[in-house]
Amino acid sequence: MNKALSVENLGFYYQAENFLFQQLNFDLNKGDILAVLGQNGCGKSTLLDLLLGIHRPIQGKIEVYQSIGFVPQFFSSPFAYSVLDIVLMGRSTHINTFAKPKSHDYQVAMQALDYLNLTHLAKREFTSLSGGQRQLILIARAIASECKLILLDEPTSALDLANQDIVLSLLIDLAQSQNMTVVFTTHQPNQVVAIANKTLLLNKQNFKFGETRNILTSENLTALFHLPMFEQQAQYKESFFTHFVPLYKTLLK
């Protein structure tokens, strides 16, 4: 089976009958990268919670065909965990309750760090790291869980441009080299253009899902963000690419 995830007629609300979204449908195959794009408060994080089973659908159903790993937008702890401790948390589903990690678990955790070229940070205290390093460590934790479907909640929101590029490149590599299915939330259209082959636009109870090249248009983005969005073609060396530019009201003054 090539299918990774199926969402059928999904409906959910926090307050009775005030649906956050309704009759939401989409399917993903193994190796797909789905960007969930929308304004703050549109339900992006709630959708991830539903996929994780934290919330139960009010309507419809969700079928997950792969093991799930999750990378939260923020992670904090009152304890002085080392980087290796954090990555080992990804092994929790493979370790019996109250049992200590085995040598194989340490090996898998170090392999996850090695995959990201971060083994030199293994003994560092997690809270001493930069925002970009912390985000990569949380991705390493998900990789150590040996998941095949990784969900990321705005993984670049606190990162500078250089670290955003590192994370986005990593997600492409996970999909292409590991055949991992990737779902990430964002409110940045140009990140969607850069890496996602599938896009889900969430706009209150309205949604659009499909191939990114068909969904990500100036018309759809303008309706989504209530701000004029212009599509532009650019060139870097011999490569041509599309990006979107917002027309901020302050520019018209």
Swiss-Prot record:
Top EC class for this record: translocase
Localization (cell): Cell inner membrane
InterPro entries assigned to the protein according to its UniProt record, in alphabetical order: AAA+_ATPase, ABC_transporter-like_ATP-bd, ABC_transporter-like_CS, Metal_Ion_Import_ABC, P-loop_NTPase
Membrane topology of this protein: Peripheral membrane protein
Alphabetized Gene3D superfamilies for the sequence: P-loop containing nucleotide triphosphate hydrolases
Main location: membrane
Binding of ATP, residues: G38, Q39, N40, G41, C42, G43, K44, S45
Domain named ABC transporter: residues: 5-229
Any Gene Ontology CC annotation: ATP-binding cassette (ABC) transporter complex
EC code: 7.3.2.5
Regulation: The MolBCA complex shows a decrease in affinity in the presence of increasing concentrations of substrate and nucleotide.
Reactions catalysed, as given in the entry: molybdate(out) + ATP + H2O = molybdate(in) + ADP + phosphate + H(+)
Disulfide bonds: none
Keywords attached to this entry: ATP-binding, Cell inner membrane, Cell membrane, Ion transport, Membrane, Molybdenum, Nucleotide-binding, Translocase, Transport
Gene Ontology MF term list: ABC-type molybdate transporter activity; ATP binding; ATP hydrolysis activity; ATPase-coupled transmembrane transporter activity
Description of how the protein assembles with itself and partners: The complex is composed of two ATP-binding proteins (MolC), two transmembrane proteins (MolB) and a solute-binding protein (MolA).
Record comment regarding domains: The transition from the outward-facing to the inward-facing conformation is realized through the asymmetric motion of individual subunits of the transporter. Nucleotide binding is coupled to a conformational shift at the periplasmic gate. This shift is akin to unlocking a swinging door: allowing just enough space for molybdate to slip into the cell. The lower cytoplasmic gate, identified as gate I, remains open throughout the MolBC-A mechanism, and cytoplasmic gate II closes in the presence of nucleotide.
Protein family: Belongs to the ABC transporter superfamily.
Purpose of the protein: Part of the ABC transporter complex MolBCA involved in molybdate import. Responsible for energy coupling to the transport system. Functions as a low-affinity molybdate transporter.
UniProt-recorded name of the protein: Molybdate import ATP-binding protein MolC
Gene source species: Haemophilus influenzae (strain ATCC 51907 / DSM 11121 / KW20 / Rd)
Upper lineage: Bacteria, Pseudomonadati, Pseudomonadota, Gammaproteobacteria, Pasteurellales
